[in-house]
Amino acid sequence: LIIRCVLAQDGGRIWTKGPAFSDGRRGGLWCAVHTAGSEIMKKRRRFKMEKIASFTIDHIRLQPGVYVSRKDQVGDQVITTFDLRMTSPNEEPVMNTAEMHTIEHLAATFLRNHKEYGSRTIYFGPMGCRTGFYLLLAGNLASREILPLMVELFAFIRDFEGEVPGASARDCGNYLDMNLGMAKYLAARYLKVLEQIDSYPESRLEYPQ
């Protein structure tokens, strides 16, 4: 008799299938081998994960604007994360990856080269839901404080002509996924929101309560 086992994890147990005979016939015996892994799985099931802050925002009432998503203390420095919401969640079509990718390249280049905010720019990148972007800046900042910067940034994207920075096989992992025309259109659309930010009946600088 030759015992040949096939391992498959099922929940917290490791199951071994066998026996298998030398002529290729299989028996119907199943045996369970309990391992330390089962205890790990039990602990994982008992661990309750809290809802993260961004999932507590009322996305039904959220409209395009500039919002403070969170502030984190890192050493003696405060990092402010801004929510640059460009479309109405669950109401308008989300942005496609090509135009978001283009906005990311242009915005990151602009911000990193900015005289005042270049050294304070930590990150600019897309939201997974494709309704906007996150901007991380060093400093304890408010939405209104960066409005001039946002107007400057999206005017730059709206008016941009030429080759998108970093749009080459050498510089980017997906350089063909670009759409400058749509990026310019979306930037112009968002710019109108920024320029009349105080004219809306609801705040576009603070999350809906």
Positions of PLM-derived features:
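Basic polycationic patches enriched in arginine
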Residues: 4, 13, 25-26, 44-46
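His/Glu-rich zincin catalytic helix
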Residues: 42-111
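M16/MPP (pitrilysin/insulinase) zinc-metallopeptidase core fold and M16-derived inactive scaffolds
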Residues: 89, 93-145
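Active-site-adjacent, His/Asp/Glu-enriched structural segments that form or flank metal-binding
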Residues: 124-196
